[in-house]
From Swiss-Prot:
This is UPF0371 protein CLH_2534. HAMAP family: UPF0371. It comes from Clostridium botulinum (strain Alaska E43 / Type E3). InterPro entries: DUF1846, DUF1846_C, DUF1846_N. Belongs to the UPF0371 family. Pfam families: DUF1846 (PF08903), DUF1846_C (PF20921). NCBIfam families: PRK13663.1.
Length: 502
C-alpha cells in the first residue's frame, strides 16, 4: 500500500488547533461527527491514517476533556443497527463507554434526546442508571428549527436539564447521525450563558475535507459513504462571501447555518465569530495529506466498495432504489467500473467456470482475495466449508509456503463439528463458516506445527481486499472484518432459499 497520509503530523496539527479554539472560551462544546473508534473509512481513503486517530487525539488531551454521549430515543425504539459492528445503537452506547474508559477518558453522562417516555428507552435508562451512569433526558425542542425566539427561551432549551461538566473541552459524540449532538451542544450553550459562563461551540467532522477540491475523489468518497443520508458536497457560499476563499462543506451544514448562527447570537447576545459553516469546524485532516495521487486512488477504490455495499443493502431491503441509483451516478461521475476493483473479475470468472462445469442454475459462491504483494487467490464454497473460509485457508497456506495438497485441519476435528451442526443443532447448512474453520485450525495448531505456522500468517491479511460473487453470511462478514479484510459482494444470494441464506 502506498502511503498518502502523515498520521503524526495530523495529530500534532489537530491537537494544537483544538487547544487554540478552546483558549477563546471558559468551555468549548465540541461536536464529534463520524466515528471516534475504528474509522475504517478514513483509514481506507487516507492510506497511513490510523483508524483510532481521533480517540488517540482525545487521549492526548485527556486532562482537559470529558465526554457526553447522545442517543435518539427513536433509534433505541426501532433497534437501529450500526452497520459496521452489527449492533444496536443502545448496545453501541455501552461499547463506547467501555472503549472511552480504556483510553482513560472521563464519560460524563448519556443524553437521551427527543425522549417522550418510550418503553424500550426507559428500560435502557434504568439499565444505565443502575450501572452508575448519569443519564439526562431531553425532549424535542419547542419551535425548532424556525422559531428562534421560542427555541432560545425557557420553553425551548430551558426545558432541558443542565448537564454539569467540569473540564474545558466537552466532547459530544453519538453512535451515529441524527442522535441530537448539535441540539445538546446548543442547549448547553443556553444554560452556560444563563450562568454567566463564556462557552463556545465547534464541530469536528473529518469529511468532507474543507480544503480539498469539491470534486476530489476523497470528497466524492464521502458522498458515496453517506448516500443513504443524501448528503451532497457543496462550495461554502458563506465562506466565499466572508473571505473570498473556496472551501467545501455539505448541504445539511450549509442549509442549517443561517438558523444556527441566529440561535448562537440569540444565546450570547452578540454577533457570532463564525461567518460560515467552515469557520465552525476544527478539522485539519487535509494538512496530513502527503501524496495526493495515493489518496485519489484509495478514494476511488472506496467509491467502488460503497457502490457494492449499497447494491447489497438494496437487495436486502435496507436501501431504497433512489439511494442505489445515486450510488451508480457517483460511480459514473468518477468514471469508474465495477471491475476497476481488482478482485471482482477473478471471483466472477472462477464462479462462471464452476457453473459451467457443474451445470448449476444458481450462482457458484466464490471469494477472491488480493494479498499485499498483488497475488490474487480464490476460494469456493463446498460441502465442507464456505468460500470465505476456503479463501482464508488458501491465503495463509500461500503466505506460509505450504503445499496445496497438505491438509491443515484433521478430519478428526472437522467431522465432529459438522456432526454437531447436522445431528444436534439440526441445521440445514452444515458447511463450516470462516470463524468455525479458524477455530478448528487453532485446535489443530496445538498438535500440528504446520497449522501453527499457517495461523501465524493471519495478521498479514489485515488491509487485504476481497470480493464475493454472492452476499456473505453475517457471520463471515463479521469474521473478515475482525481479520481486517475489506470485502465487497455482488448483490446475489447464494441460493433461492429465503431464510437459510442468512
Amino acid at each position: 500500500m502506498k502511503i498518502g497520509f502523515d498520521h503524526e503530523k495530523y495529530l500534532e496539527e489537530q491537537s494544537k488547533y483544538i487547544l487554540e479554539r478552546v483558549d477563546s472560551y471558559d468551555k468549548l462544546y465540541l461536536e464529534f461527527g463520524g466515528k471516534l473508534f475504528n474509522d475504517r473509512h478514513a483509514m481506507r481513503v487516507l492510506p497511513g491514517f490510523d483508524e483510532n486517530a481521533k480517540i488517540k487525539l482525545l487521549h492526548k488531551l485527556k486532562e482537559k476533556v470529558e465526554v457526553v454521549i447522545c442517543v435518539y430515543a427513536g433509534d433505541i425504539e426501532r433497534n437501529k443497527i450500526r452497520g459496521d459492528f452489527g449492533i444496536t445503537y443502545d448496545m453501541d452506547v455501552l461499547r463506547l463507554i467501555d472503549d472511552l474508559r480504556t483510553y482513560e477518558l472521563e464519560v460524563n453522562s448519556v443524553v437521551i434526546t427527543r425522549y417522550n417516555g418510550q418503553p424500550a428507552t426507559t428500560v435502557f435508562i434504568n439499565k444505565l442508571e443502575r450501572r452508575g451512569i448519569k443519564v439526562y433526558k431531553h425532549k424535542s425542542t419547542k419551535g425548532y428549527p424556525t422559531d428562534v425566539d421560542t427555541i432560545v427561551s425557557e420553553e425551548g432549551y430551558g426545558q432541558n436539564p443542565y448537564i454539569e461538566t467540569t473540564k474545558p473541552i466537552v466532547v459530544v459524540t453519538a453512535p451515529g447521525p441524527g442522535s441530537g449532538k448539535l441540539a445538546t451542544c446548543l442547549s448547553q450553550l443556553y444554560h452556560e450563558s444563563k450562568r454567566g459562563n463564556a462557552a463556545g461551540y465547534s464541530k469536528f467532522e473529518t469529511f468532507p475535507v474543507w480544503n480539498v477540491p469539491l470534486k476530489h475523489p476523497l470528497n466524492i468518497a464521502y458522498e458515496a459513504a453517506t448516500v443513504d443520508l443524501k448528503d451532497v458536497n457543496m462550495l461554502d457560499s458563506f465562506h466565499m462571501d466572508a473571505y473570498n476563499k473556496v472551501t467545501v462543506n455539505y448541504n445539511r451544514d450549509i442549509e442549517s447555518f443561517p438558523v444556527l448562527k441566529r440561535i448562537i447570537e440569540k444565546i450570547t447576545g452578540k454577533e457570532s465569530i463564525y461567518k460560515s459553516p467552515t469557520d465552525m469546524g476544527v478539522n485539519r485532516v487535509g494538512f496530513g495529506i502527503v501524496d495526493d495521487d495515493a489518496v485519489k486512488e484509495a478514494s476511488k477504490q472506496e467509491i467502488i466498495r460503497r457502490y457494492f455495499k449499497t447494491g447489497c443493502d438494496y437487495k436486502k431491503g435496507y436501501a431504497d432504489k433512489e439511494t442505489f441509483d445515486r450510488s451508480k451516478l457517483i460511480m459514473e461521475e468518477v468514471d469508474l467500473k465495477e471491475t476497476d476493483r481488482k478482485v471482482v473479475l477473478p471471483a466472477r470468472e472462477k464462479s462462471a467456470k464452476l457453473k459451467m462445469a457443474t451445470d448449476e442454475n444458481e450462482i457458484c459462491p466464490v471469494v477472491a482475495l488480493e494479498l499485499s504483494d498483488g497475488t490474487i487467490l480464490t476460494g469456493k464454497s463446498s460441502d465442507l466449508m464456505d468460500g470465505a473460509a476456503a479463501v482464508i485457508i488458501n491465503a495463509i497456506k500461500y503466505l506460509a509456503n505450504i503445499s496445496d495438497d497438505i491438509y491443515l485441519i484433521s478430519p478428526v476435528i472437522l467431522e465432529p463439528i459438522m456432526n454437531l451442526k447436522s445431528k444436534t443443532f439440526n441445521e440445514k447448512n452444515i458447511s463450516l463458516n470462516c470463524e468455525e474453520v479458524l477455530t478448528a485450525l487453532s485446535i489443530s495448531a496445538a498438535t500440528n506445527p504446520t497449522a501453527q505456522v499457517a495461523m501465524e500468517k493471519l495478521p498479514l491479511l489485515r488491509g487485504c481486499q476481497a470480493h464475493a460473487t454472492t452476499i456473505l453470511s453475517r457471520a463471515d462478514d463479521t469474521t473478515l472484518g475482525k481479520l481486517g479484510v475489506d470485502v465487497t459482494c455482488d448483490p446475489n444470494y447464494p441460493s433461492e432459499s429465503l431464510y437459510y441464506n442468512n
